[in-house]
A protein has these predicted regions:
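Ferredoxin-reductase
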Residues: 180-268, 310, 317-319, 330, ...
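A cytosolic-side transmembrane-helix exit/cap motif
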Residues: 52-56, 145-151, 175-184
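Membrane-anchoring hydrophobic segments
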Residues: 1-79
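Long, contiguous hydrophobic alpha-helical segments, chiefly transmembrane helices and signal peptides
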Residues: 39, 44-45, 56-57, 62, ...
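FNR/FR-type flavoprotein reductase catalytic core
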Residues: 3-13, 65-175, 241, 250-409
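Residue-level signal for pocket-adjacent positions within structured domains
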Residues: 47, 57, 230, 271-273, ...
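Extended boundary segments
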Residues: 19-26, 113, 156-181, 209-230
Length: 409
């Protein structure tokens, strides 16, 4: 399990919190104490920290556990009064701060689940009230406990440590991330519409973007009428200070981008993310792309004109009008005998099928495309070879939270 370090971080934090409250003889405060710790971890997991991304083996796993700790925190807060046994320690102000914090958290959870019905920018700002609720919760805890949490005991150190993590992480996310993380400034040099719904952007950056074939990055677009929030797009190539992104019209933002993006527009880019690294597979590889899922494979093809390994590439699409880069793929196959190209138009030959495919243990299968398609193909591969080396990713916005589905089987 590649995310074992990240899981261990959460588990150790929970166990340490339980032990700290129990050793202080305050077992009835364990549940609210755990809520503060898991809320701190919720903020920490939203920072997109590079080390944490490695520990969780991908930002997609970080978002999964971010959601888990957030929901777990709300459940703990809902049980707060029960765990306290109805005791009313501290001042009336402390109790009111705690109530306000809980109401805010519950409201924000409801907003998160209704997120698909409101604009992303509005959802994003509403979600920031979590930080305010967290501060109310900390004031509630410290006012309630008097000086117990301010002494250099195990309990005071543990609660203070996670409080600092939560406060610093939340402050960074809300006030610093947008300005500090997007260090790669650039300008759109070329807008190329590949078909009726897919556009390719060629961007010149002020400094080189370090990335690996198969990764994606968050991009901010500074053009009137566009959201200021960053959006994730797959990298489709680049060298030196040039980087390419290929984007499909699949929502409000990408539709506007396809219709109205202009050459000369300024952009800023965060670092590269993702763990579907084509260079990390075995010598023999099978690549499977569905629709816009071709993008990460194009990044490899563009920057490696001479293929030095056997690759069977299956590109699935529905109608030639929806396909992209067909000429590039055909030219690449003509120049590289080891590149076995299969173009699969579902209108002509039906959907891609790998039932009874003889997959050996010396081959890595990389897949990128619709999640349902990849899950189906993965099941087919595993039926013939339970030890199949499969790596697949698919990007979506789940309730406007960027989620990367990444599986290493």
């Amino acid at each position: 399990m590649k995310s074992i370090k990240g899981i261990a971080l959460i588990a150790v934090s929970i166990l340490l919190t339980i032990y700290a409250w129990a050793s202080a003889g305050m077992t009835n405060f364990i549940v609210p104490g755990l809520a503060l710790t898991t809320l701190s971890l919720t903020f920490l997991l939203a920072t997109r920290n590079a080390l944490l991304e490695k520990w969780f083996h991908g930002i997609e796993k970080m978002y999964t556990y971010h959601k888990f700790t957030a929901i777990f925190s709300v459940v703990l807060l809902a049980l707060h009064n029960v765990a306290m046994g109805g005791s009313l320690w501290g001042s009336h102000v402390a109790a009111q701060l705690g109530n306000v914090g809980i109401y805010l958290f519950v409201s924000i959870v409801l907003v998160a689940y209704l997120g698909k019905h409101i604009k992303y920018e509005a959802w994003r700002w509403i979600h920031r009230f979590v930080y305010l609720a967290y501060i109310f919760g900390l004031f509630h805890a410290y006012m309630l406990m008097g000086g117990r949490l301010l002494t250099p005991t195990l309990l005071g150190i543990v609660v203070g440590f996670y409080a600092i993590i939560g406060l610093v992480s939340g402050f960074y996310i809300i006030f610093l991330y947008q300005s500090l993380a997007f260090r790669h400034l650039g300008k759109i040099m070329q807008v190329k519409r590949l078909n009726h719904d897919t556009v390719e952007l060629k961007i010149q950056l002020s400094q080189k973007l370090d990335y690996q074939y198969g990764q994606f990055a968050f991009v901010k677009i500074f053009q009137e009428g566009f959201e200021k929030a960053p959006h994730p797009f797959s990298i489709s190539g680049g060298h030196d200070n040039i980087v390419y992104f290929t984007i499909k019209n699949s929502g409000d933002h990408t539709k506007k981008l396809y219709d109205k993006i202009q050459e000369g527009t300024k952009v800023s880019i965060d670092r590269a993310y993702g763990h579907m690294i084509l260079d990390q597979g075995q010598e023999k590889q099978i690549w499977i792309a569905g629709g816009i899922g071709i993008t990460p494979f194009i990044s490899y093809i563009r920057e490696n004109p001479n293929l030095n390994r056997p690759v069977s590439f299956y590109y699935a699409y529905t109608g030639a009008e929806n396909a992209v880069y067909l000429d590039l793929l055909k030219d690449y196959a003509a120049k590289n005998p080891q590149f076995d190209l299969h173009l699969v138009d579902s209108k002509v030959s039906g959907y891609l099928d790998f039932k009874n495919y003889p997959l050996d243990n010396q081959t890595t299968v990389f897949m990128c495309g619709p999640v349902k398609m990849m899950d189906k193909l993965a099941d087919e591969f595993k039926k013939t070879n339970p030890k199949a080396d499969l790596v697949y990713e698919g990007f979506k916005f789940g309730n406007y939270i960027p989620v990367y589905t990444n599986h290493k089987v």
